[in-house]
Amino acid sequence: MAKHDIEERGDGLTEKLIGVNRVTKVVKGGRIMAFSALTVVGDGDGGIGMGKGKSKEVPVAVQKAMDQARRSMVKIPLRNGTLQHAVIGKHGATTVFMQPAPEGSGVKAGGAMRQVFDAIGVHNVSAKVHGSTNPYNVVRATLNGLMKINTPADIAAKRGKTVAEILGAE
């Protein structure tokens, strides 16, 4: 399972290849080999997308995954290169816990989560995976958690207060 940077295609997006798996379908005449690729694409400023591609050849699978990731991009509200608040994400048997970290802490996360944070533009975060560490589940759980992030303006609107009241600066 190789981890690569495939930088830029001219559109300013960072592409990360998280993993390539060889899969086999057993049929009457023998085995049919194919490949599946998992990728994330980010703009370095809160935009992130995930894609999975399958093909009989690795480059085609990777290209399909990159294209799907570009089509599935979402915007996550960040604050000074870290998260707005601590958040938990779940997918399948995977639970991820992510919390903001002070400036200079760096990305304290392993495996597939580190690739997601690099692509999205988070520079200071502490994260932990509980349960299954399958890369696909970890990426999905991370994105599910990131999509739960609320900005102070969102919370103020829900409560009918001002942002200053929410932040405690009165």
Swiss-Prot record:
Superkingdom field: Bacteria
Keyword Transport applies: no
One GO process term, biological-process aspect: translation
Family annotation (SUPFAM superfamilies): dsRNA-binding domain-like (SSF54768), Ribosomal protein S5 domain 2-like (SSF54211)
Pfam families cross-referenced by the UniProt entry: Ribosomal_S5, Ribosomal_S5_C
Keywords: Ribonucleoprotein, Ribosomal protein, RNA-binding, rRNA-binding
S5 DRBM domain: residues covered: 13-76
GO molecular function: rRNA binding; structural constituent of ribosome
InterPro entries the record matches: Ribosomal_Su5_D2-typ_SF, Ribosomal_uS5, Ribosomal_uS5_bac-type, Ribosomal_uS5_C, Ribosomal_uS5_N, Ribosomal_uS5_N_CS, Ribsml_uS5_D2-typ_fold_subgr
Gene Ontology cellular-component terms listed: small ribosomal subunit
Notes on the domains: The N-terminal domain interacts with the head of the 30S subunit; the C-terminal domain interacts with the body and contacts protein S4. The interaction surface between S4 and S5 is involved in control of translational fidelity.
Quaternary structure and interacting proteins, as annotated: Part of the 30S ribosomal subunit. Contacts proteins S4 and S8.
Annotated function: With S4 and S12 plays an important role in translational accuracy. Located at the back of the 30S subunit body where it stabilizes the conformation of the head with respect to the body.
NCBIfam families: rpsE_bact
HAMAP family noted in UniProt: Ribosomal_uS5_B
Similarity-based family: Belongs to the universal ribosomal protein uS5 family.
Name under which the protein is recorded: Small ribosomal subunit protein uS5
Organism for this UniProt entry: Laribacter hongkongensis (strain HLHK9)
